[in-house]
Amino acid sequence: MSGIIDASSALRKRKHLKRGITFTVMIVGQSGSGRSTFINTLCGQQVVDTSTTILLPTDTSTEIDLQLREETVELEDDEGVKIQLNIIDTPGFGDSLDNSPSFEIISDYIRHQYDEILLEESRVRRNPRFKDGRVHCCLYLINPTGHGLKEIDVEFIRQLGSLVNIIPVISKSDSLTRDELKLNKKLIMEDIDRWNLPIYNFPFDEDEISDEDYETNMYLRTLLPFAIIGSNEVYEMGGDVGTIRGRKYPWGILDVEDSSISDFVILRNALLISHLHDLKNYTHEILYERYRTEALSGESVAAESIRPNLTKLNGSSSSSTTTRRNTNPFKQSNNINNDVLNPASDMHGQSTGENNETYMTREEQIRLEEERLKAFEERVQQELLLKRQELLQREKELREIEARLEKEAKIKQEE
């Protein structure tokens, strides 16, 4: 089926001008998930150093700050199509006992890029050099546990899926056998379906899509989550094989681009060739338009804005002791005995509690929206002030130039 991807990629290339393309992808995963190695493998060169922040069993630290690191790489394929790939790495994600700040940092970054577009669209004269920083795709790396999603995985996709195209990826899939990998994929997709998590599943319009694209998208859906293998090493194999990027084992060298054992090549082609424009269009026409409509109408920008304050998420185990009410899919209720002993009072208390929780949730939603709109208004005012200062400075420079020219003209006349 990989031939379908190649044919579809060639067809889509002919539909677009051969000019520079800018594409932004965010790589999210816990330390040890292979983010840095995957970035280097994706770009075919050393872009970032491998992470050294893997926590040891004896490490007693509970808080590690998330960092957003941006790298820009220019790629060019065999047909001369240039892609400016903006990569956002997320070292420190999921390495704390309380990971809610990490969610907020990533969410705020994505929202800020939308706000910048919204601000640019509101200007009378737009900046021709304005750079669109919107994140077109988020690759979420899942550790190969052989099980389904952990709580942190569920919460991240639940909270960020309405803002960015999330594609789930099983990293370091060579650590699993074929049967284990097949089971791992099945369990992950069952969790995604069970909790109705919003991921990018290569959507399409049945009335407009061609038969070839339909077959391609359906094939890509069967591969979710993609299973990848990365490597920072390049080996010279000799003969017709030439140079490969692979991983060395006692029994030989594994080619990470071998589609029979890894989905890496298919994922790379989907990201950078066949579905690059689809991801960009979906970001602009669906995700951004939804954000824009809700922001201007004063409604909730995303589904998570109506949730109570985030509680602590365990970044290392799905058996977390988190006490979030009605939002933890992995925690069973422990109030069964109380319900049996005193059902009437419990129902009354539950009703009152739910009403209070709904009221507080609504108040929190309104407060968050007011803060966001206030910050947006302040940013607009600041932009206007800076533009006004630039205009005044420009007028001053023009007056000085005019005065100098007049002075030079008078000197020439006197001579």
Swiss-Prot record:
GO terms for cellular component: ascospore wall; cell division site; cellular bud neck; cellular bud neck septin ring; cytoplasmic microtubule; cytosol; Gin4 complex; mating projection base
Record-listed cross-link Glycyl lysine isopeptide (Lys-Gly) (interchain with G-Cter in SUMO), residues: 412
Region ranges (Disordered): 307-360
Composition bias type Low complexity, residue spans: 316-328
Modified positions (N-acetylserine) in chain numbering: 2
Region described as G4 motif: spans on this chain: 171-174
Record annotation: effect of changing residue 29 to A: Abolishes GTP-binding; no strong effect in vivo
Chief site of localization: membrane
Matches recorded under Pfam families: Septin
Keyword field contains Cell cycle: yes
Gene Ontology MF terms in the entry: GTP binding; GTPase activity; identical protein binding; molecular adaptor activity; phosphatidylinositol-4-phosphate binding; phosphatidylinositol-5-phosphate binding; structural constituent of cytoskeleton
Region (G3 motif): 89-92
InterPro entries: G_SEPTIN_dom (IPR030379), P-loop_NTPase (IPR027417), Septin (IPR016491)
GO process terms (BP): actomyosin contractile ring assembly; cellular bud neck septin ring organization; cytoskeleton-dependent cytokinesis; division septum assembly; mitotic cytokinesis; protein localization to bud neck; septin ring assembly; septum digestion after cytokinesis
Posttranslational modification: Sumoylated during mitosis on the mother cell side of the bud neck. Sumoylation probably plays a central role in regulating septin ring disassembly during the cell cycle.
Modified residue annotations for Phosphothreonine: 327
Subcellular location: Membrane; Bud neck
Signal peptide residues on this chain, from the entry's feature table: none
Record text on subunit structure and interactions: Component of the septin complex which consists of CDC3, CDC10, CDC11, CDC12 and probably SHS1 and rearranges to a cortical collar of highly ordered filaments at the mother-bud-neck. A complex formed by CDC3, CDC10, CDC11 and CDC12 is capable of forming long filaments in vitro and the components seem to be present in a 2:2:2:2 arrangement in vivo. The filaments are proposed to be formed by the end-to-end polymerization of CDC3-CDC12-CDC11 complexes with CDC10 serving as a bridge to bundle the polymers into paired filaments.
Task of the protein: Septins are GTPases involved in cytokinesis that assemble early in the cell cycle as a patch at the incipient bud site and form a ring approximate 15 minutes before bud emergence, which transforms into an hour-glass shaped collar of cortical filaments that spans both sides of the mother-bud neck. This collar persists until just before cytokinesis, when it splits into two rings that occupy opposite sides of the neck. The septins at the bud neck serve as a structural scaffold that recruits different components involved in diverse processes at specific stages during the cell cycle.
Domain comment as written in the entry: The coiled coil domain is required for the interaction with CDC3 and BEM4, but not for interaction with CDC12 or with itself. The basic motif is essential for the association with PI(4)P and PI(5)P.
Protein name listed in UniProt: Cell division control protein 11
Lineage: Eukaryota, Fungi, Dikarya, Ascomycota, Saccharomycotina
